Each structure stands twice: as structure tokens, then as C-alpha cells.
Regions:
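Positively charged, low-complexity/disordered segments
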Residues: 766-770, 774-780
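Conserved N-terminal architectural modules of multi-subunit, DNA-dependent RNA polymerase core subunits
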Residues: 1-502, 506-765, 769
């Protein structure tokens, strides 16, 4: 399958996931509604009122005599430039920034419009608000194939002529054509953003808390929407009461039944059905309903009474209007915001809350096991684009508040309001630059930005493919450090440091991709075409969850999953969208969010791969690309959650060391590099018909044809492209790692990065990088 692997790396570099994440974050010609643009349009300073995002961000001034608001939108990222001492600007190149100890960055511009009493003034377009560091080889970089040749756009992945021209232009600019990019240049030093593991948002995890020898069943969810994260906890106390804790409500616990009544479920039977699971859970549900009705502390039996109880708890002593507004804010914005923030979304939240409670009760009666927190379906990887997005959100908020303050000062002094005279670009620039230069990120994290390890080419590659865990290094965390089955093919099982970082600092496997967010509207539209509907009774049918949000139900869930996968294999649905059917709870989970580690596998249909020998020949000649194989339904990207439903063969067959007995040229050695699979893709085949190139004792080369049994059956759904792809870039260079003990291979991955080669041929070139070479190379 080497043709498929070579095709994959012709399309993507080894740091493609970092580049793609950063490109998705920044604005560009084909990404006008980027993450940075969404942040700008969501700005609300001086007001809490909901406005349309299409009109841009909103800054409202606190002045008495007039109603003044500022609208901001249309963020643009210019060409990377250097400003000289005389004030002139000229395009910058990464090598120039390295030599002159400068930062490789671009100007950030936006459009502002001031409204006075609802009347707009002349818009100020293209106002520079600061500078943004640019990732080397990203879409905005001057070395990118779209910009390096002037007006001509090069296509180095599909055209040999363009590739040679691109490499020559890189050499002229002092760059190494083999350098993959994926890092920043800050004050002349190369810095890389380390990918970080994080808990997946909008997913319910059930666990048992042990305090003072007491066990409590607890369910947790981090509900996230537009960068806003609201944790929610449901726990079953020792007396059987089911209580909810909302992070923004402090330590106050709310009975689940009371909260569900406040959300609109007033009928006891409907409330019971929303929670009911196995028969053993019925007594707990009835007891909670009666407790909320009869206990003097609550005495709640209707939605109005539930609202009244919440008003007393969270806005006691305030006016009626304020109390109602506080409860509405709690129910709409602070409770499970990923399900919506409108009044009509409350019923859906009540149903979702009932599902969480059911899982807690099922664990209480031991019919459900605690969730595996180390399962990679419950984790997401935050890449450079996600980290820059967090940093830009905080920096932009700080800039907007500073602009509001400066405009109010100008207005109070009776000066003309001009954005260019009030805005201070250094506010945004200094905030971003400080974080990238020191590694101290927003949220209190440190070590996010690190100096790129340039000891060798391999050490730099490994550094940019590193994935770190946020767990404290001084604690044991035995389970978190262990290899997990869901890391197969996603994270290298061998490449990890020795010592306290062991198992917490990992490296990506060779052939992976990390998902970017796919708009949910695309999937919802497709589901509507597949007869998914929104019922009045959410307990009827198989529920469909899109990124944790209950979207609708379907009468035949398994048929929907099959239909959805077929559409994805035809290219009608994006390849990074995953789907899984939960047989136990009759739920369908669809994930379109970012940060899921995906790996490619071959699709099997009725016990035969869709890949044929013709496909391999066309891929080898360049007629087909790896992307074409995905769009034709030959190869499929899968994440850890969807893999739970699959049956994957580790290899199609076991190749003998020599031609088997009973065949011509028996006993002659064979290898994978000389094998042609003649009946590849043939339906109902039980043996693989192989043709091997062999060498006879007299030196003559010929072909030997023989059969070996296939390892996959009609029950298998997929097959690995190559088992060796489970290793990372360092472990894959160790000869025969399967014949060594694991600790030795782990030590070998560290030594591989220390092997010095020839750094460059032109030693007189003014390179700012540390040059390391062996003064006494081994003669062996």
C-alpha cells in the first residue's frame, strides 16, 4: 500500500494539521467568515443586548447627551511587512526576520462605523488595530505557493514544474525546501505552539466521587458555545436526592425535578418518562418527585412555583423585574448553552437533563459503568489555530474596552470622534506578542509557546507534532499515563519522554489528521432530507445528537446511520464528520467539531476492499490523489468514537518470508516492497493471489505467483492501510522495533533526534539557526 502512503504525503506535510488549524483561524480570500471574524462580530462592550452578528461587533459609549455606538467588522490580515525607522514599510521574509531579530507579522485592519442617535457617520475602513504574528508556510505567509511567485499561483502538490519552481524560489530566499513550517518567528527566534489535550465539550461523563469513604454518583458536562464554557454537575446524594449545580450559580444546588419543572415539564407522567430507565430506577424518580412536592423547603408542583423558588434563591430582596430577568438568564444562557439560548429551547434542555439523570441512576443501580475519561472520544486536541483564537478573543476584548474609554474621553472633552485618533494598536499587539514570546497563555496556562528544537531536522518535526496533557506532572496519574486502545493509529505508542513527563507528553502517529469544525447547518440540512423530524414527544424514536445537541428523532436509526455513511463516502457529506449508533440507549451521535484525531482506513464491502489494483496504478502514476480515494469511498477517515462500531482487520494477509511450498520457486525470499496483489478488491475471495519479484541463485530476476489466506472476513468493515503507521516519525526510523523491548524503543526515539547530519553545504551563509555537526564522525 506504499502508493497510498506516498500519495498522502504528496498532499500533506507532517505539520499539515498545525497549518490547517491556523489557516482556518485567520481571515483570507476563501475564508471570509473566519474564527477571527466571528470573534470581532461577537464583541459586546457597554451593553448586554442581543444584536445581529451580521452588522458586526457593538461598542456602546456611556455618555449622557447622546446615544453613541460603534460597529466593527470585516477583519483583514495584510501582507507580512517590516516597518523601518524612517516609517516606510516593505514586505518581509522569514530569513530577514531571523537575521535582524524581528517578528514575522502582518497588520490587522478592520472597518468601523460610528452611530450617533441611530444615524451612521462616514465609515472608517481599513483601520489598523495592531499586528498579528504569521505562521511560517501558512496561507498568509510570503513563502506560500499563492504568494511566492507574485501574481502566479503555484500548485506544487500536483505539478512537478510548479514544485521545482517553488523549491528554487525558496532557495533564493534562503529557505530550506524541506522545512515544513508550522512555527512563528518572534524577535528573531523560532517558536512553536504545542498542541494540548482537552476534555471534549458537550459530552456527559459519569463517574463516582469518593469522599471520606463515601461514594457519590456524579455526571458532569462542559457545555460550550461560541467560546463560552459552562460546567454543569448532577449528583445523587446519599439520601437519594438528585441535585444540579450550575457553575455560575455558585455552590447552590437545585433539585433536578424542580429545575425540570422550571424548564416547562409540569406533568408528573411526562417528567417520569423523561428520566425513566431500568425498572430499578423508578423508585428514585418517584421519591424525588414527591420530595419536591411535599418538603417544606420546596413545595413546588408547577412551573410558576419553580420560578418563584429560583427567584428567592438567586435574587432574594430584588425587584420583581430583576428577579424574573435573573431566572431567565439562568435558564437560557447559563444552563446548557450549547442547546440554545431561547425560551423555546427549554423543553429540549429538560429532556437532555433527564438523560443525564438517567445515566446517574443507572450507575447507582450498577447497570452502567463509569465513563472512561482516557477514551479519546472524550478528548479533543487544541492546535495552533485554537490557541491563537483564545488569545485573540481576550486581546480583542481588551482593545475594545480601551477604545471605548478613549472615545468617552474625547467626547467629554468635546473633541471630534475619530477611530484612528482614539485607537491604540499597541494594546492588541503587545498582548499577543507577550503570550507568544513567554508561553504564558490566557487562562493561566504556561509553556504553550516553546523555543523550536533545531538540534536536528527530526527533532524539529517531532517538536511540532507533540501533544501534551494538562495534568500535573508531580502526581502519579497512572491511568492517564498508560497507553489506551483508542490511541492506536493516532498517537505513537513509543515516543514519550522518560521521567515525570512519561505518558503525559505524546507525539502524533504518522498518518493522522485533526478535524476542523464543519458548520452544523450543513449536517442539519442533510438530516432533514433523511426524514429526521422534531417531535412533541422526544421519547419516541432514536434521538439524534449533533455535537451534543438533541436535533431530532428518526424511526429507523440504523438505516439512517447507513444512509449517512453512504452519503459521506460519495462526497455529499464532508469526510471529517463522524457518526455512531448507540445500541443500548438508541441514540445517534454525530460529531462535526474540531480537535478530533482522525486516521484513514480502507473500506471493506461484503468482505472485499473497494480498493483495486487499478486504483493503486492510478495513484502511483499521479492520476488519482489521496483525496480522490476518500471521495470515491475507497478510504475513510474515522475518529475514536466511530471506531467503536467498526471491525478493523490489522492487515489483509500475512506475507511469508519465502515462496510457500507447492509453488514454483518455493523457498525464494520475498518482501512487501516487491509484492503485487493481483486479485485486490475481488468479491468473495478467500485467498490473496500474490505476484512477487524474486532473484534466482544465478542472478536472474523473475516473478513468482502464489496464494496466501486472507485475514479479513465478511464481518470486517475496514482494514488498516499499513500497521506500521501506528508509529510516529521517530519510532518509524528504528529498524525492527517489534523485536526490541518497549523501553529500548522509547529510548531509541529520543536518540534518533540526537543523530547529527550535515546541516548545510554553504557554511558561509549567514544563518541565525544553531548549527550542530559532529566533529569526529564515526567511520563505521
Amino acid at each position: 500500500m506504499k502508493e497510498i502512503i506516498e500519495s498522502f504525503f504528496r498532499e500533506r506535510s507532517l505539520v499539515n494539521h498545525q497549518l490547517a488549524s491556523y489557516d482556518d483561524c485567520i481571515p483570507s480570500g476563501d475564508n471570509s467568515l473566519s474564527r477571527m471574524e466571528k470573534i470581532v462580530r461577537s464583541i459586546r462592550v457597554g451593553t448586554d443586548e442581543e444584536v445581529e452578528d451580521e452588522k458586526g461587533g457593538l461598542i456602546k459609549l456611556d455618555v449622557i447627551d447622546q446615544d453613541i455606538i460603534i460597529r466593527v467588522k470585516n477583519i483583514q490580515l495584510g501582507e507580512p511587512t517590516i516597518r523601518e525607522a524612517d516609517g516606510s514599510d516593505h514586505p518581509s521574509q522569514p530569513m530577514e526576520c531571523r537575521l535582524r531579530k524581528l517578528t514575522y507579522m502582518s497588520p490587522v485592519r478592520m472597518d468601523f462605523t460610528i452611530f450617533k442617535n441611530g444615524v451612521p457617520t462616514q465609515p472608517e475602513k481599513g483601520v489598523q488595530v495592531g499586528n498579528m504574528p504569521i505562521m511560517v508556510r501558512s496561507r498568509r505567509c510570503n513563502l506560500h505557493a499563492n504568494h511566492i511567485a507574485g501574481d502566479r499561483v503555484l500548485h506544487p502538490t500536483t505539478s512537478d514544474e510548479d514544485r521545482k519552481m517553488w523549491e528554487e524560489l525558496l532557495r533564493q530566499k534562503g529557505e530550506d525546501p524541506l522545512d515544513p513550517g508550522g512555527y512563528f518567528i518572534i524577535n528573531g527566534t523560532e517558536r512553536v505552539l504545542i498542541s494540548m489535550e482537552d476534555l471534549a465539550p458537550n459530552r456527559v461523563t459519569v463517574e463516582i466521587n469518593k469522599r471520606y469513604a463515601k461514594k457519590t454518583e456524579v455526571a458532569k458536562i462542559f457545555s460550550q458555545r461560541d467560546g463560552m464554557r459552562k460546567p454543569l454537575t448532577v449528583e445523587k446524594r446519599r439520601d437519594g436526592m438528585l441535585m444540579v449545580k450550575i457553575s455560575t450559580a455558585g455552590t447552590t444546588a437545585i433539585p433536578v425535578v424542580l429545575l425540570m419543572r422550571a424548564l416547562g415539564i409540569e406533568n408528573d407522567q411526562e417528567l417520569f418518562q423523561a428520566i425513566a430507565g431500568p425498572t430499578e430506577t423508578f423508585k428514585f424518580i418517584v421519591a424525588n418527585i414527591n420530595e419536591v412536592k411535599d418538603n417544606e423547603e420546596y413545595t413546588v408542583d408547577s412551573m410558576d412555583e419553580a420560578h418563584g423558588w429560583l427567584e428567592k434563591k438567586f435574587a432574594a430582596g430584588q425587584q420583581k423585574e430583576y428577579r424574573e430577568a435573573r431566572v431567565n438568564q439562568l435558564l437560557d444562557r447559563e444552563l446548557l448553552p450549547h442547546l440554545g439560548d431561547q425560551v423555546e429551547d427549554r423543553k429540549k434542555k429538560a429532556i437532555f437533563l433527564g438523560r443525564i439523570v438517567r445515566q446517574v441512576l443507572e450507575m447507582a443501580i450498577t447497570s452502567r459503568k463509569p465513563n472512561d475519561k482516557d477514551h479519546y472520544a472524550n478528548k479533543r486536541v487544541r492546535l495552533a489555530g485554537d490557541l491563537v483564537e483564545d488569545l485573540f478573543r481576550v486581546s480583542m476584548g481588551q482593545l475594545a474596552r480601551d477604545l471605548k474609554y478613549q472615545l468617552e474621553r474625547h467626547h467629554n472633552r468635546k473633541r471630534e470622534l475619530k477611530i484612528t485618533s482614539c485607537l491604540r494598536p499597541d494594546v492588541l499587539t503587545s498582548k499577543i506578542m507577550h503570550a507568544l514570546a513567554t508561553g504564558n497563555w490566557v487562562g493561566g496556562r504556561s509553556g504553550v509557546s516553546q523555543l523550536l528544537d533545531r538540534t536536528t531536522y527530526l527533532s524539529a518535526l517531532s517538536h511540532m507534532r507533540r501533544v501534551t496533557s494538562p495534568l500535573v506532572r508531580s502526581q502519579p496519574h497512572f491511568e492517564a499515563r498508560d497507553l489506551h486502545p483508542t490511541q492506536w493509529g493516532r498517537l505513537c505508542p513509543n515516543e514519550t519522554p522518560e521521567g515525570q513527563n512519561c505518558g503525559l507528553v505524546k507525539n502524533a502517529a504518522q498518518m493522522i489528521d485533526i478535524s476542523e469544525a464543519v458548520p452544523e447547518e450543513e449536517i442539519r440540512t442533510r438530516l432533514d432530507e433523511m426524514d429526521v423530524f422534531q417531535p412533541d414527544d422526544w421519547t419516541d424514536g432514536d434521538r439524534i445528537h449533533v455535537n451534543g445537541d438533541i436535533y431530532g428523532v428518526h424511526k429507523r436509526g440504523k438505516n439512517l446511520v447507513t444512509q449517512f455513511k453512504n452519503a459521506r463516502r460519495r462526497g455529499a457529506i464532508r469526510s471529517e464528520v463522524s457518526i455512531r449508533y448507540d445500541n443500548v440507549n438508541k441514540d445517534i451521535f454525530i460529531n462535526t467539531d474540531k480537535g478530533r484525531i482522525l486516521r484513514p482506513v480502507l473500506i471493506l464491502y461484503d468482505g472485499a476492499p473497494r480498493l483495486t489494483q487499478k486504483h493503486l496504478e492510478m495513484v502511483g502514476s499521479g492520476e488519482l490523489t489521496f483525496k480522490d480515494l476518500v471521495n470515491e469511498g475507497v478510504v475513510e477517515w474515522i475518529d475514536a468514537e466511530e471506531e467503536e462500531d467498526l471491525y478493523i482487520a490489522p492487515r489483509p494477509f500475512v506475507l511469508p518470508e519465502a515462496v510457500p511450498e507447492g509453488n514454483e520457486y518455493a523457498g525464494r525470499p520475498v518482501s512487501h516492497s516487491s509484492i503485487t496483489w493481483l486479485n485486490l478488491g475481488e468479491p468473495s475471495a478467500t485467498e490473496a493471489n500474490l505476484q512477487a519479484k524474486i532473484t534466482l541463485p544465478n542472478g536472474t530476476k523473475t516473478d513468482a505467483v502464489f496464494n496466501v489466506p486472507l485475514l479479513y472476513t465478511s464481518e470486517h468493515t475496514h482494514c488498516e492501510i499499513d500497521p506500521q503507521l501506528v508509529l510516529g516519525v521517530c519510532a518509524s526510523l528504528i529498524p525492527y522495533p517489534e523485536h526490541n523491548s518497549t523501553p529500548r524503543v522509547t529510548g531509541g526515539t529520543a536518540m534518533v533526534k540526537q543523530s547529527l547530519g550535515l546541516p548545510c553545504l554553504l557554511y558561509t551563509s549567514p544563518s541565525p539557526r544553531d548549527k550542530r555537526q559532529s566533529r569526529m564522525p564515526s567511520s563505521a
